[in-house]
Amino acid sequence: MEEYTKAEILIEALPYICKFHDQKVLIKYGGHAMVNEQAKNWIAKDLVLLKYVGINPIVVHGGGPEINRAMEKMGKTPEFIHGLRVTDEETLEIVKMVLIGKINGDIVSKLELYGGKAVGLSGKSGQLIKAKKKIQYLMKDSQKIEVDLGMVGEVEHVDTKLIDILVEKRYIPVISPIGVDHQGNDLNLNADIAAGDIAGAMNAEKLIMVTDVDGIMDDIKDPSTLHRKLTISQIEGMIERGLITGGMIPKIEACINALDKGVQSVHIVNGKTPHAVLLEIFTEDGVGTMVVRE
């Protein structure tokens, strides 16, 4: 009976394997979902399996918790505005050290441990991400004021040629969110927003944001308030009502941006759920919150 059940589970995945065969799926691997060792193993196995059944995962990773720890060790206090890290020159060097120097290589090694072929990149590789300094505005006393985030960028252009070559050669690209401006200066990119831009440029079928929450909820402390499916207009209403704040704001911005650029659906899932990526792609009910245009 147990063997029959296993076979049924495999057969349930068949329509989705057919549907998404040779499609690109952008996986945004969030900082908080990378802390748990078991969760890291689940995600790596999921991505390798996707590749072997003919689906093309592309990874963009963050690293917020490890960046925070590195900053604190160096006597710096992390500062955020609307979920975006304020980045001076010293902070940018720490960000690059952690993202490019440590986390990217760790993810590549984990994927290769489970039989995948992976290549670590940053937005600097092959002029992958051209960026410009981000101008951030806040409302204060009913007035719009400009806030200086420092060396924080936003994506101007994604050159997909290098990613296309790697995908064609059966590699899993793993991308650190560091961009370069037209003067050759490095800029810190929010990983969620960069993932949305890359997903759109790559014509990805899905963007899956792996984080440490179950999805979009009215009350983060009450799992029963989880939304299984939302449209852009519904999300915009939640922002207006103050139900979406802090670090979830860049995720939502990335969702909307990716959908506007042609991605069919965006999914926010909890990386601490065993094999969340496989459950999202290969089961009828999926997991987390799905966001669609309308």
UniProtKB/Swiss-Prot annotation:
GO aspect biological process, one term: L-arginine biosynthetic process
Domain of life: Archaea
Reaction catalyzed: N-acetyl-L-glutamate + ATP = N-acetyl-L-glutamyl 5-phosphate + ADP
Pathways per UniProt: Amino-acid biosynthesis; L-arginine biosynthesis; N(2)-acetyl-L-ornithine from L-glutamate: step 2/4
Organism: Methanococcus maripaludis (strain C7 / ATCC BAA-1331)
Keywords from the UniProt entry: Amino-acid biosynthesis, Arginine biosynthesis, ATP-binding, Cytoplasm, Kinase, Nucleotide-binding, Transferase
Protein name per UniProt: Acetylglutamate kinase
EC number: 2.7.2.8
Chain segments annotated as coiled-coil in the UniProt record: none
Membership in a protein family: Belongs to the acetylglutamate kinase family. ArgB subfamily.
GO MF annotation terms: acetylglutamate kinase activity; ATP binding
UniProt keyword Methyltransferase present: no
Site positions for Transition state stabilizer: K28, K251
InterPro entries registered for this protein in UniProt: AceGlu_kinase-like_sf, AcgluKinase_fam, ArgB, Asp/Glu/Uridylate_kinase, Glu/AcGlu_kinase, NAGK-C
Functional note: Catalyzes the ATP-dependent phosphorylation of N-acetyl-L-glutamate.
One GO CC annotation: cytoplasm
Binding-site residues for substrate, renumbered to this chain: G63, G64, R85, N188
CDD domains: AAK_NAGK-C
Keyword Isomerase appears in the UniProt entry: no
Cell compartments where the protein resides: Cytoplasm
